[in-house]
Amino acid sequence: MSRKIEDLDPRCQDAARKTLNALNADDELKNSGVAGWLIVETRRELAVQMAYFSRGRMAPEHVRMMYDAAGIKQQLSDKETQTAITTTLKSKHLAGLAMDIVPIKADGKAWWDAPTRVWMRMATIAEGFGWESGVRWKDFPDYPHLQWRGA
């Protein structure tokens, strides 16, 4: 699991940098309380994808075993183990063609529950640089997710 732009497929690295620069420079986002953006994940190993996919599909103890096997150091509550966070084993993250980003508040903390307008603005800006945004997915919205459209 990586957070580095350099671990993305070379075809989308420049777009990732430009997207983050544009997000950080956007006055509408600044006025909404966004101080910056954190890359949560870029390229992902299959074991990590399988662990994510197990959530909501396996018993809590088995989900935790999947997380341990993937090397994910995260303590999950029983409720979290039963909450699906992906619908696929074929994520664009596996090929380095996706990244998850989250806004940061002025206190430096990730703003996972930012208002919808923040996520929609992020989507609009990112789409201008060639990304498809999970914000717009009807069946399973994934607000932090951006995947390269050229792939």
Q: Where are each of the predicted segments found?
A:
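Catalytic cores and adjacent binding grooves of peptidoglycan-active enzymes
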Residues: 79-151
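Short aromatic/hydrophobic-glycine micro-motifs
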Residues: 28, 34-35, 57, 130-134
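Mixed-charge, low-complexity intrinsically disordered segments
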Residues: 50-91
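Short loop/turn and capping residues at structural boundaries
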Residues: 41, 63, 136-138
